[in-house]
Amino acid sequence: MGVDIEDYIKISQKYRIGERNGKGSECILNTNILIFKGEYLNGKKNGKGKEYYRNSKLKFKGIYLNGLRNGKGKEYDENSKILFEGEYLNGKKNGKGKEYYRNNKLKFKGEYLNGLRNGKGIEYYNNDISKFEGEYLNGKKWNGKGYNYRGNLAFEIKNGKGKIKEYYENGKLLFEGEYLNGLKNGKGKEYYRNSKLIFECEYLNGLRNGKGKNIMIII
């Protein structure tokens, strides 16, 4: 659970008189719960710093400039598992970076712009086999090839368009259908983990749209 906006307001009011310079820390008002420790310049976070969850686990460590994440940094979940490591600009992911599954397996490595995947990248299954290799645009797969859980070619996308297949981590088919502008658009089918068909319908901008056929499975 993160710090709510009221807590942040109280913290900013507490330190309004005088500007911080050098090393310092921030706690939630009227508690000893640490939420930040690092360097300041003219009252703003500048230089090395660390953010913390309420449970005292590390949330982020990296470089700040003018109060925002800038430069190299690492993000963690509340159980200290790494989620992301890479470059930031003005508080957003920019440049090269890596995302991780909660078991520390690599999930994605590639380029970012304004917090989204942009440029070359490789997405991975949890078994280290490539899921998609190619180019992203505004967080969407745009040009490249997709692979099944065994590493065999499953689909190809050009300029955000093509027919795609997505898989569960047990290798079973999850979705197959049409892709346009980097999203599910057109006819598609969804499947259970046991390969039984769940649903087939039309999609628009990544969402189910219009009439569809829901397949009931009686166990």
Model region roles, listed by residue range:
Residues 1-219:
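Glycine/tyrosine- and acidic-biased, solvent-exposed loop/turn segments at the edges of beta-strands
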